[in-house]
């Protein structure tokens, strides 16, 4: 199940530069992180759901690419985002 409209709006408000900023790298990474965290709970219950696991791996790969792009463009924004999201890098 995907994130609710309210949850997405809260993430956009927290990580975006404006109210309609849905395309910045920070917002995209934050949305992907929320979806990944939601799916991790799903997999603790449904261990053999390989179809959804493929989607999860795709999301993780997309997030990794966005983080690499952000790190190349602006290291300070990258470090701030990693800290705010609690990612390990």
From Swiss-Prot:
Cysteines paired by S-S bonds = none
* Coiled-coil parts of chain: none
Q: Which GO terms describe its cellular component?
A: cytosolic small ribosomal subunit
* SUPFAM superfamilies associated with the record: S15/NS1 RNA-binding domain
Q: Which domain of life is it from?
A: Bacteria
Matching Gene3D superfamilies = 6.10.250.3130, S15/NS1, RNA-binding
Query: GO molecular function, one example?
Result: structural constituent of ribosome
InterPro entries from the UniProt entry: Ribosomal_uS15 (IPR000589), Ribosomal_uS15_bac-type (IPR005290), uS15_NS1_RNA-bd_sf (IPR009068)
The record's keywords, sorted A to Z, are:
Ribonucleoprotein, Ribosomal protein, RNA-binding, rRNA-binding
Matching entries from Pfam families are given as: Ribosomal_S15 (PF00312)
Task: Report the family membership.
Answer: Belongs to the universal ribosomal protein uS15 family.
Outline what the protein does.
One of the primary rRNA binding proteins, it binds directly to 16S rRNA where it helps nucleate assembly of the platform of the 30S subunit by binding and bridging several RNA helices of the 16S rRNA.
Q: What is this protein called?
A: Small ribosomal subunit protein uS15
Q: Which organism is it from?
A: Yersinia pestis
């Amino acid at each position: 199940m995907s994130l609710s409209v309210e949850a997405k709006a809260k993430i956009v408000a927290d990580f975006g530069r404006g109210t309609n900023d849905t395309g910045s790298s920070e917002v995209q990474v934050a949305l992907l992180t929320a979806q990944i965290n939601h799916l991790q709970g799903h997999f603790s219950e449904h261990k053999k759901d390989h179809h959804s696991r493929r989607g999860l791996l795709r999301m993780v790969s997309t997030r990794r690419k966005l983080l690499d792009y952000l790190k190349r463009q602006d290291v300070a924004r990258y470090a701030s985002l990693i800290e705010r999201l609690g990612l390990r890098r």
